[in-house]
Amino acid sequence: MASVEQPNKPKLKLYSYFRSSCSFRVRIALNLKGLDYEYVPVNLLKGEQFTPEFLKINPIGYVPALVDGEDVISDSFAILMYLEEKYPEHPILPADIHKKAINYQAANIVSSSIQPLQNLAVLNFIGEKVSPDEKVPWVQRHISKGFAALEKLLQGHAGRFATGDEVYLADLFLEPQIHAAITRFNVDMTQFPLLLRLHEAYSQLPEFQNAMPDKQPDSTSPTAS
């Protein structure tokens, strides 16, 4: 992968789990910006996020976390904003304030109203409260509600990508969520033609494809699934 020169600096380290959509967002950004990084797998199913070593990096025990020299940043949105300011090559935010606002809104719908309801802790909790036949439909309903809002938000703004013909922040949040909806939760995407079209556009971009869960080194681990 082509990389931006970082003289006299150690390589970036990304603590990631292959299936984590939050980590997926950051992997896309690193690829878009051409930043070389070391992938450090954290197996969530084995509880490695709660080890003393990882909790020193991120006390809340979530992935992703990024180490850049002496800087340690956790939370995908914080990481993306850090990367945008420190490594401005291939900006992930548009200059236009109105378009920027749409990007923030789309990212927030995903990160606040959809993704938290499908994370591992929530799925385990829901699995204790409902039958196995009810768990996936519960997740599908919440994803579909968020997707319906995104379809309305992006109407009139989308071009080749979510907010025009360049890849921006909204796209980094959308593709991991769409991918999870299709591959993990069997959401019927024909209800959301705009999002489905965007998903197909992302499939043509190597920066997105190289960030896919099945392309990560920990996806082949016997305990990964």
UniProtKB/Swiss-Prot annotation:
Principal location: cytoplasm
GO term, biological process aspect, one: L-phenylalanine catabolic process
UniProt subcellular location: Cytoplasm
Keywords, alphabetical: Cytoplasm, Transferase
Gene Ontology, cellular component aspect: cytoplasm
Database matches in InterPro entries: Glutathione-S-Trfase_C-like, Glutathione-S-Trfase_C_sf, Glutathione_S-Trfase, Glutathione_S-Trfase_N, GST_C, GST_Zeta, GST_Zeta_C, GST_Zeta_N
GST C-terminal domain ranges (all copies): 96-221
SUPFAM superfamilies, sorted: GST C-terminal domain-like (SSF47616), Thioredoxin-like (SSF52833)
GO molecular function terms attached to this record: glutathione transferase activity; maleylacetoacetate isomerase activity
Protein's name according to its UniProt entry: Glutathione S-transferase zeta class
Domain of life: Eukaryota
The protein's Enzyme Commission number: 2.5.1.18
Family: Belongs to the GST superfamily. Zeta family.
Domain GST N-terminal per the UniProt entry, residue ranges: 10-91
Binding site for glutathione: 20-25, 49, 63, 75-76, 115, 119-121
Top EC category: transferase
Catalytic activity: RX + glutathione = an S-substituted glutathione + a halide anion + H(+)
Xref: Pfam families: GST_C_3, GST_N
